[in-house]
Every structure is written in structure tokens, then in C-alpha cells.
Curated annotation (Swiss-Prot):
Protein family membership: Belongs to the phytoreovirus minor outer capsid protein P9 family.
Gene Ontology CC annotations of this record: host cell cytoplasm; viral outer capsid
Function of the protein: Minor outer capsid protein.
Full protein name: Minor outer capsid protein P9
Origin species: Rice gall dwarf virus
Pfam families: Phyto_Pns9_10
Length: 320
């Protein structure tokens, strides 16, 4: 794709990406992999060099914000070595004259209110923008350069993902300023506009979901037989101050999970301690439903994961 897109064409392409994030659910990267990877591949191709900016704009908009968070968490939790490339740009062409204007028109065209952007503080907003820009460059891979270092890049990029998710989770302690532009439910909302009350519920759910997923990931992978996945899990445990024990339970959980297509159940999490408090998964009779992207793929799934090389990788990320 070369040159700039006319507004009509650009809006149509942007709408597809907005819908992707508005409709995204936890675990879609695995549970609905064929469709999701295909849609992300198209979105990356359409956005080209603007892919990081497009994700950031969707992150700032209340309608698509949570979808972006779920998408990033799914990539972080994935043990497929190629999934991080979904954040990489597909080419060096910037196809939009003014992305923000096109985004605004696209949201309006989808019947979302014009002024629905979250007022995220400058500190975290700048951090997220810089993160996406960096991943746009460093997560992209070329077959011409080879993929001999895919394991090391998986470790580095996944650590970066978990770090930004940690910072996001911490920032959710003070979300009231983020809601400044959103209306109160008592005053009514326009079209599909979200109210302050709705976003408070979304942020509350996000905190619990992230905390539960992190605990599950650490418990499952700290003793993984895969040294690269284990390195990431140990980093995450340190980052989140989660106490772990060195034994074979994590390895056994991982092997058992592969047999059933999931990595662990809440019952395998009993006794995990961390600074996440009430967000720790418990098995005391109150079942916690989890849907993170921590599943193993079916053997017949050989879809692209952001670049052409991914279909060459086996389930544990090695060439197969």
C-alpha cells in the first residue's frame, strides 16, 4: 500500500479496526484465533506505519479502551513465540493525512458520541504511546533477516508487555480524572456513549481480571519446562511481588493443562499469595471465571500470528 488514503476509504478501514477492539473478548486470541488473527493482520496491513497510533487512539477512546487492554493482555499471556509480532508494523508507509480526524469521523460513523475520549494522565499516556511506538518497530520481523533469535525476542518483548500492563494496573487506583469528559448516568447519554458509572465498572473488572490472570500465569509457568517461558514467569513474579515456591507443581499443571487445552484451573491456584490482595484467585467455593488467553492451540491451527514466519512454529515456540 502506497500513498495517502482518501477520507472515505480511510474511515472504512479504520472502522474495521475500531470494531475489532470494541468486540474483543478475553481469550479471543486463542478461542477465536482464526478470525482474530485474520482481522488483526488486515488492520496492520491497512494501518502500516500508523498501527501504533491507531492502537493508541483506540486505547484513549472509552468505547474501545477495554478491548485494547484485553488484546495486550492476551498477547502477554500467550506462550506462542510469534504472537508479540501482532504489535509490529507491516510496512514503512503512513497512509493517513490526519489519523485523529479520521478516527473521530469513524467513531461518529459507528454511532459513538464524538467526545468520548478518556482523559488519561500525561505520565501514563506518554508511557503507553512510547511503548506502542517501540513495539511497532521492534516487534516487527522480516523473513529476510531470519528468525534465529525469536526466543530471545519473545522474552524481551513479553517482559515489556507485562511491565506496561503492571503500570496500567497501578494507574487504575486513580481513574476519576480519566472520566472527566464522560457524562453522568443520571444526565443521560447519547448514542453508544459510556457514562462515568459504566467506565468505573469496566475499570474495576479490569483490575480483578488482570490480577487473576497474572497470578494464574505465574503459578502455571514459574516451573515451566520451557526456559524462555519460565524466565518471563519469574520476571512477572518479581514485578508483581508474588511469592513462589520451586517445585514440580507448575510443570505438572502445565502438562495437565495441555491435555485439556487450558493452562490451569482456579483449584490449582489455591494458596497463592501476593500483594494483589482480594484479586488472588481462590477455590473456597466462590468460583472465579477466567477467560485469559492462556490456552494451547489446536494442532491444526497454523494461522499467521502477525507475520509470515509464525506458522512455522510449533506450540512451544520452536521451529517444527
Amino acid at each position: 500500500m502506497a500513498g495517502k488514503l482518501q477520507d472515505g476509504v480511510a474511515i472504512a478501514k479504520i472502522k474495521e479496526t475500531i470494531n475489532l477492539f470494541c468486540e474483543y473478548s478475553f481469550g479471543d486470541l486463542v478461542n477465536n484465533r482464526r478470525e482474530i488473527v485474520g482481522r488483526v493482520h488486515d488492520a496492520r496491513k491497512n494501518a502500516a506505519l500508523a498501527w501504533p497510533d491507531l492502537i493508541m487512539n483506540c486505547f484513549l477512546h472509552s468505547a474501545s479502551h477495554y478491548g485494547v487492554v484485553k488484546f495486550l493482555l492476551d498477547i502477554a499471556l500467550s506462550t506462542r513465540f510469534g504472537d508479540f509480532t501482532l504489535l509490529g508494523v507491516s510496512s514503512q508507509n503512513y497512509p493517513f493525512y490526519d489519523l485523529h480526524v479520521v478516527m473521530t469521523k469513524a467513531f461518529c460513523n459507528l454511532d459513538f458520541a464524538k467526545d468520548e475520549y478518556l482523559m488519561i494522565n500525561d505520565s501514563f499516556s506518554s508511557m503507553m504511546s512510547a511503548f506502542l511506538d517501540e513495539e511497532g518497530v521492534h516487534s516487527a520481523m522480516s523473513m529476510e533477516l531470519g528468525i534465529h533469535d525469536i526466543e530471545d525476542r519473545f522474552v524481551l518483548r513479553t517482559k515489556r508487555l507485562f511491565y506496561i500492563i503492571h503500570e496500567y494496573h497501578m494507574s487504575l487506583d486513580e481513574i476519576e480524572p480519566w472520566l472527566e469528559k464522560l457524562p453522568d448516568a443520571s444526565g443521560g447519554t447519547l448514542l453508544n456513549q459510556k457514562s462515568k458509572e459504566q467506565m468505573r465498572v469496566i475499570f474495576s473488572n479490569a483490575k480483578v481480571r488482570i490480577a487473576n490472570s497474572i497470578n494464574l500465569y505465574v503459578t502455571t509457568h514459574t516451573n515451566s519446562y520451557n526456559e524462555y517461558v519460565r524466565e518471563v514467569a519469574e520476571y512477572v513474579a518479581d514485578l508483581w511481588n508474588i511469592q513462589t515456591t520451586t517445585n514440580t507443581q507448575g510443570h505438572e499443571n502445565e502438562l495437565a493443562a495441555e491435555d485439556f487445552g487450558v493452562l490451569a484451573s482456579s483449584s490449582q491456584m489455591n494458596g497463592t499469595k501476593s500483594e494483589l490482595g482480594d484479586s488472588v484467585i481462590k477455590s473456597d467455593g466462590n468460583e472465579v471465571k477466567l477467560e485469559p488467553a492462556m490456552f494451547t492451540r489446536n494442532d491444526d491451527e497454523e494461522e499467521l500470528a502477525g507475520s509470515e514466519f509464525t506458522s512455522l512454529l510449533s506450540d512451544d515456540g520452536r521451529m517444527g
